[in-house]
Amino acid sequence: MRYLLLPLAVFFLCQCGSPQPPVCRTLPFGSRGAVEPVMETARRNWDILADPRKKQEWPAAENEYNRAVAILFDKLRCENGDGWSARAAAIGTAICAPDKLHEDPNDQDAVFPATEVRIRSSAKHRASQGVGIPAVGWTATSPVGVPRPKFHPPNGQARNLTVTLDFSNKTPQWRFAKRWVTESLAIGENGHHLAADWSAPIDFFWYMCELDDLRIQNVLIPERFTEETGLYFLQPYDPKKIPIVMVHGLVSSPDAYRDILNDLSPEPWFREHYQVWLYNYPTGTPWLYNSMRFRQIISEAGDYVRAHGDDRTLRKMVILSHSMGGLLTRTAVTDPGTKLYHAHFEKPFGQLEPTLKPEARELIREGLLYKPLTDPKRIVF
């Protein structure tokens, strides 16, 4: 038996530690060499893409431009230098100022090519051809069990980015397009479709996030993970988009909607009109309590939305629910009257024992004599 102890110890030690974003410590072999000829290739093909008279050359120019920019992006992220701006300056470029369509890589904890993400299923890999290098931006939060700002998911948020090098000015500028909100890149007076990898940010999020590791624990020891009951915004809140809330079922986690997100993300209508909110809860907790917490947290999200503008999109909220999630949702939007209360108590609420603690009395009222949610417009059970 003792001969098994060392291999077992090694095995369990190898399971320790949280996953980390890719770090480029050495410039890839294919990206080594002088900057100038690669920069000139990128610039020359940019000029072709800017010229409507050379439209027949655009497909080849797009490929050559992307190939050159991929090499330059490797140099930007892998070469020595203190920060993105310093590394950009070292190769004669600059980082464009962030705006509603572009991220600042200095605000991300990691930015790396989408090709560095292990895609769960090649058959379900969703990508779009176009100009630029699909990339993933990662902003870290705290792990499961550690407090974090409200509506921030555990571990972090993944951004869907497309990296381009803009030669419109004397100094080429790196642009990190927020691919979820922008479709094209202006080159000269021509609009060119941006490349995208829709699956990479989703698969990387679930590689980093611990929620999907808690399915069994959430049933057997739900009290250990009640602090992770909550609503998580997959992207920063956008007051112009309709929330679509996804509520998982028994012995499950929000990753139950992973394939749906993967299929919907490439759709422009979905990205234009909707934002995704994932709801997580321990499924081993009594369903009436879970339903109460769902109502409370959706109401808190409503308060957050109204504090950041009007609630027109909130009143168009869509909820997708599955299994136990459907039970929670149906209960949350249905006026119980006194039916739920009288299923548990014979005395009227006002005649309950005076020795009952105030917090217990409030729990009964919130759990059984509540007012239903009114914001959701559409619910899919």
What label would you give each PLM region?
Residues 258-274:
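Short amphipathic alpha-helix adjacent to the substrate-entry channel of hydrolases
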Residues 18-23, 48-56, 60, 77, ...:
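Serine-dependent carboxylesterase/thioesterase catalytic core
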Residues 16-244, 253-259, 275-278, 310, ...:
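Flexible, membrane-associating and regulatory peripheral segments of lipid-active enzymes
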Residues 5-13:
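Bacterial N-terminal signal peptides
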Residues 254, 258-262, 288, 292:
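Short, surface-exposed alpha-helical segments at coil->helix boundaries
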Residues 1-3:
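Positively charged n-region of N-terminal signal peptides that target proteins for export
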